[in-house]
Amino acid sequence: MRVADFSFELPDSLIARHPLAERHGSRLLVLDGPTGALSHRQFPDLLDYLRPGDLMVFNNTRVIPARLFGQKASGGKLEVLVERVLDSHRVLAHVRASKAPKVGAVILIDGGGEAEMVARHDTLFELRFTEEVLPLLDRVGHMPLPPYIDRPDEGADRERYQTVYAQRAGAVAAPTAGLHFDEALLEKIAAKGVERAFVTLHVGAGTFQPVRVDKIEDHHMHKEWLEVGQDVVDAIEACRARGGRVVAVGTTSVRSLESAARDGVLKAFSGDTDIFIYPGRPFHVVDALVTNFHLPESTLLMLVSAFAGYPETMAAYAAAVEHGYRFFSYGDAMFITRNPAPRGPEDQA
């Protein structure tokens, strides 16, 4: 399979650069996996597609204000994007500067704060701050909006580029499928008899990195930390026992659950994952998926194609463009049921 198989034309006007007035105000494109049939709905209509006894699995990671601006003590402006918090004072970060800081260099943070560059790990810099990292980021950090939202972050992004159920700080990108849910909709879902469970996957900036190989089988995924607790395993077993479906909210929830079931058996898991899901890979846990519209040639589009089938996914994306759906993080959503016999690009006539 080639990366180019997952390309499509997207007008710039369809890239959502701001959230809608209401979280639930998005549109919902429903793709029936077994038939490929499409339905054009509004996001609250998701209720019509959920059944009593289903289990929705959400990612409760919390986006940290991971972008910092500052300068080297020796002079020269720079930008820091925290990739991973290592402990209370140390992070791994991307540093953008005219000249990369050397080990021992001191970084002065705009708004107050100081860090030392203590090591370099390939493209990432290990920084040690003089004060606790998370309070510092909350005080002077900026929300790390994706590169395709080409505007400075605004005060509203602190709330809207965050799910209402976010708990565990550590992500530098939002699990965007969850942005559509407000408390009122969650209450209606619960009232219908749909259970919920929470995993954690701290989304890294690598989620926006382009695939730089021709054959997707040659691509190596970035690592992200996740946790699937025993409570989630128990909830899924109970869901199966009552005949319910496991509905993953977002590709990060899919990657969490499928990482914890790599040998075909779901087990509690905590640690790094570099799982890469593309057409041909089986799914062991997830039956249905809520997800946003993803970038052309992205690993997330490949995951959706593995779940729904390649021709069905690309046809759905073509329909979304034709009908003016809004794309990417602040855009519209899909609800997809798993295709029991998904085809890949190589299966096309």
From Swiss-Prot:
Gene Ontology, cellular component aspect: cytoplasm
GO molecular function, one term: S-adenosylmethionine:tRNA ribosyltransferase-isomerase activity
Pfam family, one: Queuosine_synth
GO annotation terms (biological process): queuosine biosynthetic process; tRNA wobble guanine modification
Keyword check for Phosphoprotein: no
EC numbers, comma separated: 2.4.99.17
Highest taxon, organism lineage: Bacteria
Key words, A-Z: Cytoplasm, Queuosine biosynthesis, S-adenosyl-L-methionine, Transferase
Pathway: tRNA modification; tRNA-queuosine biosynthesis
Record-stated family: Belongs to the QueA family.
Subunit structure as annotated in this protein's UniProt entry: Monomer.
Name of protein: S-adenosylmethionine:tRNA ribosyltransferase-isomerase
